[in-house]
Amino acid sequence: DYLPGGARQGLRELLSAATIRYARETGDADAARAFTRAFITEFEAYGPGAFTELVRGYAAGDDIDLAWRARCALAARGLVDADGITAWRDADGSGEAQRHAARALASLPDADSRAGAWESVFSGALSNDILSATLAGLAASSWEGDAGTGAAIDRMEEFWQSHTIGMSLRYVRGVLAVGLDIDRPGTVAQTLDALRAWLDSHEGAPAQLRRVVVEHCDSYE
């Protein structure tokens, strides 16, 4: 069963505090890292509060994996800007930094950043990993305006026909994760309605594509 919306915030704060406590108290480095990752994931999803400075500390830390997770979380909540993200990317210089930065830039919760991210997705010029990272960033963002998935859903068959199966699957699955938020139940219904409409109007679409869409519809019902 799901908790009522009004009861969730208190539980989230308890969960965040518990994961940090366990990360600090465990003597196992792998367990500490796992608890810290869980804490950062919770922060990315539900936002600023008493733990913001702690996340900023991880973002500036020496553990590159945790640092980029924290940077992406800060970006998704609008607590860092594009200049800060590109500075981190350029200072790192690795391929992983390129991927993380693409995710962080796409997750910035402002209209211009989202428009730029969607434009790059539609351009067809992204690598598999950067495409997935960009779509993951769009999905992770705290942006509460139009998710932009309408046009992306409309383009699914076109994208499928013009790209490899692997990239097409990344596109479709990534697009269908954008804009869903259990704290806003209407987003699930809107996506489900859009997918049903797409199925009705694309009866001749490739069978594998239709199957992926049907599977997502089933999971949302």
Task: Locate each region found by the language model.
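Long, ordered, helix-rich scaffold segments
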Residues: 1-221
